[in-house]
């Protein structure tokens, strides 16, 4: 099992700092997504079966160890929870309720009454810009991972019709447009949401630019609103 860093002192011996990074489920997300893409392109059922087995193993492993996906990985669980979209694509291709139930669980962790970070859905309805949701945004406000989670929230709306999810992503996108656009036609500063629109210069990751484009394309496809 490799779900999170349990010993920060041991990690420090290797990394020279108390590193809590664990990208296992993030990497499994892209493995799952790749299997589903090649299945949808070519129709070979072995790739769908491999995707199913991978997802079942992950869900069962979390259950067996009594670990919530929001408590895995790093950056408040966002890299791990971004598996939401391919998990829903898998549900769409199989109809297996196990994958929808797991997706619903992830959405619940993003819309919590207790306010635990990152709480992306709930916070999108607040008046605060993203970088002010919690203290020390450098510890949690990762642009790519956050937008990838919200892409999954849109997929959840597409499959379930939950309009709260659509509205949350619309509000989130409005906040990013207002507070996080940078001079490079991307969003965020370096790899974080940090009120980039207030900076006179810019630095960005290509993945942030790509996911900002993806999020707007998805919103336009779902709403027809030309602003996206």
Annotate each predicted stretch with a short phrase.
Residues 1-228:
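Glycan-recognition and catalytic cores of secretory/periplasmic carbohydrate-active enzymes
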């Amino acid at each position: 099992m490799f779900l999170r860093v349990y010993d920060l002192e041991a990690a420090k011996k290797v990394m020279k700092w108390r590193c809590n990074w664990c990208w296992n489920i993030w990497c499994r997300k892209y493995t799952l997504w790749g299997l589903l893409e090649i299945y949808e392109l070519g129709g070979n059922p072995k790739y769908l079966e491999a995707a199913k087995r991978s997802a079942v193993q992950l869900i069962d492993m979390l259950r067996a160890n009594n670990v919530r996906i929001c408590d895995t990985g790093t950056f408040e669980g966002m890299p791990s929870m971004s598996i939401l979209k391919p998990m829903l694509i898998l549900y769409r291709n199989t109809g297996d309720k196990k994958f929808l139930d797991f997706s619903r669980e992830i959405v619940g962790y993003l819309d919590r009454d207790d306010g635990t970070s990152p709480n992306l859905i709930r916070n999108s309805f607040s008046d605060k810009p993203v970088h002010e949701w919690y203290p020390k945004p450098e510890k949690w406000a990762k642009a790519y991972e956050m937008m990838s989670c919200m892409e999954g929230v849109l997929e959840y709306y597409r499959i379930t019709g939950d309009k709260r999810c659509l509205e949350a992503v619309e509000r989130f996108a409005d906040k990013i447009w207002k507070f996080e656009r940078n001079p490079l036609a991307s969003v965020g500063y370096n790899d974080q949401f940090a009120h980039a629109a207030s900076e006179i210069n810019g630095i960005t990751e290509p993945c942030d630019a790509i996911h900002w484009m993806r999020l707007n394309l998805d919103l336009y496809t779902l709403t027809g609103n030309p602003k996206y």
